[in-house]
Amino acid sequence: MTRNLDASAPFRVVFVCTGNICRSPMAEVVFRHLADASGHGARVASSSAGTGDWHVGERGDERTLAALQRRGYDGSRHRARQFTADTFDVNDLVVALDRSHERILRGWARTEEDADKVALLLGFLPNPTTLDVPDPYYAATEMFDDVLGMIEDATRSLFRQLEPALRPGSRTAAFPFGAS
């Protein structure tokens, strides 16, 4: 995947899970933190969405917000939204949190270009032991911390792959990833 970057058009990443109240908000917040901490906050933007509409307009799950806060992140401004086919148009990379989301997103893709934007978050790790970030929604609170750890590792790996294209003077981002 290749995309021209300029100061007026940040590279846009959307993270997608089921209800947009647990996993994808974690990834969005962590990615935004990495972008801001690296000085690239103006050149990259992150958002999140869910494949379902059950929680549209709601805040993140309280256990999600607590896990983020324990690690020094602020997810308090998050409001759940649903991914639609139009979401492909405003994003450069669509990151699925598990293979079921990946299948759904590829099914919603209207073009090959849309489908090529879809990648699995754990696929950015050098040697993933799984490709699915487990859904902590029905699990104990500790699972939220474990899931956040997985998301942090994979999001850091994703950002490391993206970061060279965000440096001043870089006009084109050619990514070693794309369709997974």
Regions found by a protein language model. Name each.
Residues 2-90, 163-170, 175-178:
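Conserved active-site segments centered on acidic
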